[in-house]
């Protein structure tokens, strides 16, 4: 962000966790890279007293900065919604904007419910998500390999290319049982996939990364080590990509991609659309 960038406060207001509004706001605000947005999440605004306090906070920010803050809302209760809407902010009602149009299209009235977009702790979907998270944690970095046949996908690549965060994101967001397995210099010397994962060729998806970026990441973990040198990184990346091409494994570079983009590509390429 440049020194001359514009600063603007953003309030993310919800009567539940605020995750939906936060995710939407990040996507929208990312289109304005000349603005230094200051996001503040206000979850569980589920009483009129909390709504009043939220409105006062928004008004104070507007008075202090001289500009009304941007307010993203997924409030459901009409009274709470009305009170926060009265505050001096640029108010964006995410549910109201879309629900009314869908009501017209369907010829039906919606049945508002707080937190409905998120899973209940006793639901089957929630339990599947927890099972997937536990699976991904147990099968991180090739630690446990006895149940790889149960994996939905096995991510492969050199150390520190983004396998672990992608595996956990797939588990948490999509209940995907994602294992990950490292490709090491020993594997490159043998010029073949590790025997542990070779039987699961149809489950494999590769992640790569630019050597320069890999060196930066590894230096944060092991400064001044051979493991982090640009020469070692170039060697490992080149050999890993050669191995994946030879084995016919689809892969992508994680260098400039977010975890969300990587995960979406994995889902599409492996045929795990959710």
Curated annotation (Swiss-Prot):
Taxonomic path: Bacteria, Pseudomonadati, Pseudomonadota, Betaproteobacteria, Burkholderiales
Enzyme class per UniProt: transferase
Membership in a protein family: Belongs to the pyruvate, phosphate/water dikinase regulatory protein family. PSRP subfamily.
Protein function: Bifunctional serine/threonine kinase and phosphorylase involved in the regulation of the phosphoenolpyruvate synthase (PEPS) by catalyzing its phosphorylation/dephosphorylation.
Pfam families in UniProt: Kinase-PPPase (PF03618)
Organism superkingdom: Bacteria
Protein name per the record: Putative phosphoenolpyruvate synthase regulatory protein
Residues spanning the membrane: none
E.C. numbers: 2.7.11.33, 2.7.4.28
Catalytic activity, reaction form: [pyruvate, water dikinase] + ADP = [pyruvate, water dikinase]-phosphate + AMP + H(+); [pyruvate, water dikinase]-phosphate + phosphate + H(+) = [pyruvate, water dikinase] + diphosphate
Residues binding ADP: 157-164
GO molecular function, one term: phosphotransferase activity, phosphate group as acceptor
Origin species: Bordetella avium (strain 197N)
């Amino acid at each position: 962000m440049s020194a001359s960038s514009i600063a603007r406060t953003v309030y993310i207001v919800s009567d539940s966790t605020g995750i939906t509004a936060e995710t939407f706001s990040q996507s929208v605000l990312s289109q304005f890279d000349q603005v230094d947005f200051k996001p503040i999440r206000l979850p569980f605004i589920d009483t009129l007293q909390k709504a009043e306090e939220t409105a006062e906070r928004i008004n104070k920010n507007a008075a202090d900065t001289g500009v009304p803050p941007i307010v993203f809302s997924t409030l459901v209760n009409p009274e709470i919604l009305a009170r926060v809407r009265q505050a001096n902010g640029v108010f964006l009602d995410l549910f109201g904007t879309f629900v009314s149009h869908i009501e017209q299209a369907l010829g039906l009235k919606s049945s508002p419910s707080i937190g409905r977009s998120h899973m209940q702790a006793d639901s089957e979907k929630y339990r599947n998500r927890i099972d997937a998270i536990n699976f991904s944690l147990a099968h991180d970095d090739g630690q446990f390999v006895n149940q790889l046949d149960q994996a939905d996908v096995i991510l492969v690549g050199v150390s520190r290319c983004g396998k672990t965060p992608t595996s956990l994101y797939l588990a948490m967001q999509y209940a995907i049982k994602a294992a990950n397995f490292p490709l090491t210099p020993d594997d490159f010397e043998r010029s073949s996939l590790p025997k542990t994962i070779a039987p699961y060729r149809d489950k494999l998806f590769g992640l790569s990364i630019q050597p320069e970026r890999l060196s930066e990441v590894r230096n944060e973990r092991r400064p001044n080590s051979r493991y982090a040198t640009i020469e070692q990184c170039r060697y490992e990346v080149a050999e890993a990509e050669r191995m994946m091409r030879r084995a016919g494994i689809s892969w992508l570079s994680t260098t400039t991609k977010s975890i969300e983009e990587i995960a979406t590509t994995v889902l599409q390429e492996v045929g795990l659309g959710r």
